[in-house]
Amino acid sequence: MALKHFFYSAVTLAVAGLLSACGPQIERDNVRKSDALSPSQEMALSNVVSSQLAPLTLGGGDYLLLASEKRGLVLVDAEGAEKLALDGGKVERFALQALAEDQWLVAAYDEDSAELQLRLLDTDQGVPRIRYLAAMPTSAPQVALCFSRQAERTHLFAIDESGLGQEYVVHPREQAWEFTGVRPLYFGEQVSSCAVDDRSGKLLVAQPPLGIWSLNADAEMDEEREVFAAPADLDGKAFGGLWLDRASGNLWLTADDKVLAFNINAPAQGAQFKRALLNMEPVSAVTYHGQLLALAEESDRVQRYQVELPQPAAEMQAFRGPLEIPRVRASGQTVPVQSGGDAADDPAIWVNPVNPSASLILGTDKKSGLNVYNLKGALVEQFAVGRLNNVDLRPIQHGKFVAIAAATNRTDPGVSLFGITGGGEVEHLGLRNLDMEDPYGLCVYRKGADLMTWVSDKEGNVQLLQIVPGQGDIDWTLKKRANLHVSSQVEGCVVDDEMQTLFFGEEDGGIWRLDIAAFLAGTAEPQLIAPVDGERLAADVEGMGLYHAGDKSYLVVSSQGNNSYALFTRDGSQFVGHFKVDINLDKNLDGSSETDGLEVSSASFGSEYPQGLLVVQDGRNRMPSQTQNFKLVSWADIAETLNLQ
């Protein structure tokens, strides 16, 4: 009997302990229920079975679009009356993007066909209709879809159940719309939804239990992935259903039994709205004419709630997004370099004086050597001579060669020389060692009959060298003529041969100009003529080139920090304009970004480049993602975009 009483007491204490431990949670749940929102109205649906909704305006009327596991997509009016349905397919996720007036682009994942499908939602004589545009098979179910507008293009982000994301440009062709792949994105499992804020250019991804991520939507920028909202901010384990109210600047989402809203520009302020819903765990929530609408998973009921919603943030009214820089489409590209990672660096252009269309592009692979390309971007020749960084060339008078190219070599510190024949053959003339720890930047120029080169050490000093031809074809030497001390790292440089002026870029400082003759005479020092300001020039200042065309001559500079290219007057004293190199869908070319080196020529290279050619290193080679390469841009397109004519 005593033993039985002992067990009874032990069980009683254990249960009491459990109840005591659960007490705070039960108390919190009771408080939550007492404050939970009750629906003011219920919108009944007919055999929809939906887990996502979104509001839209069409033909002057207000509608809700719903994903349907039974009927694909269903459109209902403000009262819940059904207006159209696909009546086929199993859809849990869709993305919605406004196009022209009364036109919406819809991307949906159909589980029955395992396809990403594009449709156009519009009206025909005032009656809503939905039309098929295109479909693309997928290898895994898609769990998150969201659209982005970039440079008047429509981009689609699609993330599958394993966390592998893809960015596409979706665009019309003659017969149907196309999905053009831009890049992959990697998140890991349990992604639940995504949204894009086009004003800030941020892609937002919900990934329970890690939180909500924010990263750059533009593939030509670093991801800069950071936490938009941590799990503690969300107060729930199962969160998602991201929906952006662009008018107010609030990001709405669901978490367990709650609906939350965050200021898109100030997530650190915490949730601007957080309310539990009575007897409901929503998976999709939106605002609609001052009301909150919510939907449970696989539901046939939309709940309406009368509740005070957060007002548009004051800063949202003034926010206009990042400075828009004009864009010029890429005209061509070279094949990717063989080395992975940060490899391609600096180009030079050899103009064939007899047949300009047979000119060459020399490009460094700073992990292996020098690549030679034709103007179609095909690889003509490779020289595996070491880690070449910067390359430049000039024409010469010589018995065999019509031009000499020089490149800094960081494997065995020195300068590698190359000769170019009149027929376009490139020969390696060997390495000339330098008393320099790490040769980095380089630019070649002519001083009368002499061939000169400036070479920078990564630690800061810049040497002036003369390239002296010898008796034989490869018997060349370097003679040091002067030393220029600079305070920080210099890579990009170019010389105006006619004016005998050196321009060089201090990566985080700006553009400097030096009168070479006066410097050699001891009467001049470099002048800072264009400091880094974050807009016209954003650090790092990298590649430089001179476009020579009389009074239409320009200094062209790579502004790496904002992925743009700045034009200055020939003397560098005045800013003329800037541009980005953009996607060319007609040629299936991506743009360029994170550019190190560049070169430009005003020669006419034929119908594709009648006013000259700009070649830039592309640090992020997309469409599809590959190793780095060089992009080619027609100067005629640059001149038209910046009104240089």
Question: PLM features: residue spans?
Answer:
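Sequence/structural signature of beta-propeller domains
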Residues: G23-Q645
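Gram-negative bacterial Sec-dependent N-terminal signal peptides
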Residues: A2-C22
